[in-house]
Regions:
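Hydrophobic anchor at the beta1->P-loop junction of P-loop NTPases
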Residues: 25
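A cross-kingdom feature that marks ATP-driven nucleic-acid transaction machinery
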Residues: 5, 14-15, 21, 30, ...
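Structural recognition of the conserved hydrophobic beta-strand(s) that form the central parallel beta-sheet
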Residues: 93, 117-123, 144
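Conserved catalytic segments around the Walker B and adjacent sensor/switch elements
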Residues: 42-59
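Short regulatory helix/loop adjacent to the ATP-binding pocket of P-loop NTPases
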Residues: 109, 126-142, 154-159
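Conserved lysine of the Walker
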Residues: 33
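Short glycine-rich substrate-engagement loop in P-loop NTPases that contacts/grips substrate
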Residues: 55-88
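Interdomain hinge/linker elements that couple catalytic modules in large macromolecular machines
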Residues: 158-346, 360, 367
């Protein structure tokens, strides 16, 4: 199993909660939820039962229709799974709990009983049909699990030293030098291409074959498409999802739903975006109408951009119209030799990094009065009651007209300004020019 940062959060929950809450881990399909939870169960408990509700028998699911006799429930589970449960020393895992809403509702009584600990995993947790007619337990602590971040990817390929050293570089505010920078950029581009889905990472490690890695990612994308069709048989969710790379490549000030779904009503659009967001396959960046430390209070729900939650899946979706993404394309991307403008690939990677760091995504556009075109700040972070605007480029050019205009307009609100680009660390007056591999330290 790959080392995952969320394991430490599981340990923290076990110690702090002492069985007073269940832990609900939300995440997209195939990010590794079940794997890490089962590893946690093996290492930290005397015994455990894992109930995979996507495969559980009808008899097991029916046990949760009447939980008035918990002694009977636990006896039946031990018989079904041939596992002895020990009071306060065993864990029961509800895997894919969205497939059995009554099991999720039972958490209230199970936690109050306090005999065992409970971890739930799921995707599409809040979709209407998955919470219909059940009482959502208040005894849940929710955490999100994302694809492997850059550091977890490096751990997987046997590198435990680069990130701690990069943190020192970031803190020092000095460049690393041309030779080391080239290697760091190539390594980061490798992460952007493979991504953080454990199956794809494992395939890369075992075969070093981009075509096989790409097929794994296509299989995952097809799985997501199947999930979308179960939620929305009309195919609208799938269309919105598939269009994400093209929409970002347009460089428009928002995701233009009308160019994907003609004549769709506003309330239907908002519901579709909420469902995509709930699937954890998509990251939503909202327009901050008034950029300040409280941007969540003034975001425009109707003006947004969509990103994929995994940079590797994004790379594959970019070339979805081909039978497979040829090795030559991967090689050119890896060596920074592809002539296409890849700004949207870099922006998607930055969105993923910021989300993994726990930041909500916001951006801001405003009119350039002389050209009548928009300035755009790609991302805005809230820090210390101020904001940090970020502009992202896929080149090494230190041009930053949008940052400069934003600075003039909101000078009293800004803590730090960042230009993310492909060159080594530099300072351009009061702007920090950072290579993309340092974004994780913002």
């Amino acid at each position: 199993m790959f080392r995952r940062k969320i394991y430490d959060k599981l340990l923290e929950w076990k110690t702090e909660s002492d069985g007073r809450t269940a832990l609900l881990i939300e995440g997209a399909r195939r990010v590794g939820k079940s794997t890490v939870v089962e590893e946690f169960a093996k290492n930290e408990y005397e015994s455990y039962i894992l109930i995979d509700f996507s495969r559980a028998s009808k008899a097991v699911k029916e046990l949760f229709e009447d939980i008035s006799d918990l002694d009977y429930l636990f006896l039946q589970l031990q018989l079904q799974y041939k596992v002895d449960l020990h009071e306060r020393r065993s864990l029961i895992i509800f895997d894919e709990v969205q497939q059995c809403p009554l099991a999720r509702q039972a958490i209230k009584a199970l936690v109050a009983d306090h005999r065992y600990d409970y971890v739930e995993t799921g995707s599409l947790i809040s979709i209407k049909r998955n919470v219909k007619d059940i009482l959502i337990p208040s005894e849940e602590r929710k955490i999100s699990m994302y694809p492997m971040d850059h550091e977890e990817f490096l751990w997987a390929v046997g590198d435990t030293t680069t990130i701690p050293l990069l943190k020192k570089v970031f803190d020092s505010g000095k460049p690393v030098g041309a030779q080391i920078h080239r290697k760091l950029m190539r390594d980061f581009r490798l992460y952007m291409l493979v991504g953080g889905m454990p199956q794809a990472v494992n395939e890369y490690i075992e075969t070093n074959n981009f075509r096989k890695v790409d097929q794994i990612k296509r299989d995952i994308l097809n799985l997501y498409e199947d999930d979308f069709k179960k939620i929305d048989p009309t195919g609208k969710l799938s269309s919105l999802f598939d269009a994400i790379p093209a929409q970002l490549n347009k460089n428009a000030s928002r995701y233009q739903v009308s160019s994907v779904l003609n004549g769709e009503r506003a309330e239907n659009i908002l519901e579709s975006i909420a469902e995509l967001k709930d699937s954890k396959t998509v990251l939503v960046s909202y327009h901050a109408n008034d950029p300040n430390a409280g941007m969540s209070n003034n975001k425009d729900l109707g003006k947004f951009k969509l990103f994929l939650s995994d940079t590797g899946l994004f790379t594959t979706l970019m070339f979805k119209d081909r039978d497979f993404t040829e090795n030559i394309i991967y090689e050119k991307l890896l060596n920074d030799k592809l002539s296409a403008n890849l700004g949207y690939l870099y922006k998607n990677a930055v969105a993923q990094i910021l989300t993994a760091n726990g930041d909500a995504l916001f951006y801001h556009t405003f009119m350039n009065e002389s050209t009548r075109r928009n300035y755009e700040i790609d991302f805005i972070l809230a820090r210390k009651n101020k904001v940090c605007p970020i502009e992202v480029k896929s080149s090494g050019y230190k041009t930053h007209a949008s940052l400069d205009a934003f600075s003039r307009k909101f000078s009293d609100r800004i803590l730090d300004k960042y230009l993310i680009y492909t060159k080594d660390f530099a300072k351009d007056e009061d702007i920090f020019c950072l290579p993309i591999y340092l974004v994780q330290f913002l």
